Design a protein with these regions (language model features):
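Active-site neighborhoods and metal-handling regions in enzymes and metal-associated proteins
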Residues: 1-278
Length: 278
């Protein structure tokens, strides 16, 4: 659940021998029954103030005690513990229990970098679902906006609905703007009514099917008039930028090679260019 992302009650311990323990909802151990990798289901990792109040430290010590017992059995003699997203009281309690806390996010990110065939198929499915959701939003925008009275929020709501319809989960941002609000970029969508013959731009930033993030950007011209010449020129330059950079993406390509050979935007597009290369 998204709620766990900002009120973390769930934790997973992966021991050196492969033994995996999950701390979950106290009365819902069945949530992990489908996963053969989970050997134990426990409760008690809800180490945040909303749940524990002034006794978070007591709960953290109890949690650290469970971790100590588990590792004594499944990783005897080992005291290094990599944690990716530690709650503060948990960090203190585990350190006090004698563990050497190390960076766990690097470990998990590098593990995610290796994709098995099922994960590749899941990614393709998620991308297809995202593209279908965008198509639904585009159909609504092109049909409804010319009638008038359609806001940025109205269009953005369609992407949410189409994502959920296909098994998606949530959307991280609200990056959809229209007309003059598209520049500078990074404003959130709002109640502005979108006019005809205006630009509509968005970035999906959605967590879609199988919990996979699909981050796609699109810019649409809504209306029957031709866009201004400077808009057409900017679009053509952006298309060239994408196509040149795509040609460099191939197995074995290194980051330094991509950095050295990437397409360079013209000077007038440098000031507000995006924060990443591609």
């Amino acid at each position: 659940q998204l709620w766990n992302a900002h009120n973390p009650f769930r934790a997973v311990l992966l021991c050196a021998d492969g033994h995996m323990v999950i701390w979950d909802y106290k009365n819902a151990p069945f949530l992990s029954c489908f996963n053969p990798l989970v050997r134990e289901v426990r409760a008690g990792a809800d180490l945040f103030y909303f749940d524990r109040g002034d006794k978070v430290d007591d709960a953290a010590r109890a949690f650290a005690g469970e971790v100590s017992s588990l590792l004594a059995e499944h990783a005897p003699g080992l005291t290094r513990l990599a944690i990716d997203k530690p709650m503060l009281h948990a960090h203190w309690a585990l350190a006090a229990a004698g563990f050497t806390i190390t960076e766990g996010e690097e470990v998990t990110e590098k593990a995610r970098a290796v994709k098995c065939p099922d994960e590749i198929r899941a990614m393709r499915c998620a991308v297809h679902a995202c593209e279908a959701a965008m198509a639904g939003m585009e159909a609504y925008a092109r049909t409804a906006i010319p009638r008038g009275g359609v806001t940025e929020n109205d269009v953005w709501a369609v992407l949410h609905a189409e994502n959920i319809r296909r098994g998606g989960e949530w959307i991280e941002t609200r990056l959809l703007t229209s007309g003059p609000r598209t520049n500078p970029w990074f404003q959130e969508c709002g109640p502005r009514e979108i006019g005809t013959n205006e630009i509509l731009a968005f970035d999906t930033d959605l967590i879609g099917t199988y919990g996979i993030c699909c981050d796609m950007s699109r810019t649409w011209w809504i209306g029957t008039d031709r866009p201004r010449p400077d808009m057409v020129d900017a679009m053509r330059h952006a298309h060239e930028h994408i196509m040149v950079n795509m040609e460099m993406l191939k197995p074995g390509a290194t980051v330094p090679e991509l950095s050295a050979g990437c397409h360079v935007l013209r000077p007038e597009f440098q000031k507000q260019k995006y924060g990443c290369l591609m």
